[in-house]
Amino acid sequence: MADIMIQRLVLASNNPGKLREFGALLAPLGIEVVPQGDLGIPEAEEPHPTFVENAIAKARHASRLSGLPALADDSGICAEALDGEPGVCSARYAQKAGKPKTDAANNAHLISQLAGKLNRRAHYHCVLVLVRHPADPCPLIAEGTWTGEVVDAPRGAGGFGYDPHFMLPRLGKTAAELSAEEKNAISHRALALKELLARLQAAASNNGNGRPA
């Protein structure tokens, strides 16, 4: 599959958890992933209200500064009872309350905001954007959603972010209790990447020369 696809790209993220997951997901395809931090590229601003807009901005930023095709991820957890919060602010949710930008602080703030609410349904959402160059007029966009519930008590030592509090009722486990292999088969990020690869393969086939049009 890798022979009809981009073989080297810059990943527009400095998040260690995301870097691990993308490395594991893309390695079998023979795609070399270069973290933007290795190229001295700072993180892009994320001023937009939607995952799609932020992912596009991050991908163009990384491609412009690296000269490489770029893959960007914008993702977060959305709680029904909070009208979709933390949403695009998931990584910096606690900062809204004047607290540190850490996973522990973000989780504590989410639990405090859900206190007294019966509806604990939530979903992780991921948008992936691939640009072949900074001015790519037709970025490839894919999305994935992973549904679950927010639980007060953390469980598990794996994953990152809100995973210890993200319960998967069908499995009876939190995302943090899954092995890396289990998570990478069913997560929002895995689903989005599967869709992205299918779109990339279709674009290459339609163009007929092994490269997307």
Region locations from a protein language model:
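Anionic-ligand binding patches
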Residues: A2-V10, P16-V34, D38-A213
